[in-house]
Amino acid sequence: AKIKIIVLDRPNPIKGNLIEGPLLNMDYQSFVGNYPIPIRYGLSIGELAKMMVGEKWIKGAPKLSVIKMKNWNRNQWYDETGLAWIKPSPNIPDLNTALIYPGMCLLEATNINEGRGTDKPFKRFGAPWIDNARLSNRLNKIKMPGVEFKPVTYIPTDIDGMAINPTFKNKICKGIEIKIIDRDIYQSVQIGLNIISILRDEYPNKFVINDKRMISLLGVDELNIFNEMPIDLKTIFSNINFIETSKKYI
């Protein structure tokens, strides 16, 4: 018998009107990407649940009931809702981290420390062999929208409940801290991809991408995009079909 599933809907913390990143190719379905949606999909959890059932992505789909929200505007950031922030993950302590995460989580498929083991996970990244002054200058010259990059030095350590054996544990890392200047134009996935592209260009003998892991995180086998600088997602990936289909569930 089908089990009834009740979803108490809640706001998408990084707005419900922005979509970013490639559409998952189901050939690369995995624990971190299970359905054909972009990295940043622009739906509430209830809307996504309705789409999963409506598009028959689940075999033996449950009887779904979504308890709708009241007074949510898709253009709202979470801190504009009046609701208290509750960490969705130990390493996403605040809203800015949630916004940065869709792009910077891609560093988890590399040999760079992604800020785990610090009080600013995903807001900073580094390695012992990075020239942080040179790298910050190069990143800032691209003039990516809504962001500035500043050089930092830090030491990743174990943090109870947050990080165990972070990359470059107890080693001095020279790196970059991400400062969001305008969150409304900040393009998380595009910024993450450009950072990886530049690291690959700057440190071809030291920076390493785990191809299999990166394909899982991206959801597509398009690693040649890291040959481009700067990367413009709009010219590479199209989410038109997803956008049109998702409208049925909004």
Predicted feature descriptions by range:
Residues 6-28:
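Glycine-rich, charge-decorated loop segments at or immediately adjacent to ligand/cofactor-binding or catalytic sites
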Residues 72-148, 156-157:
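Glycine-rich, aromatic-lined ligand/substrate-binding cores of catalytic
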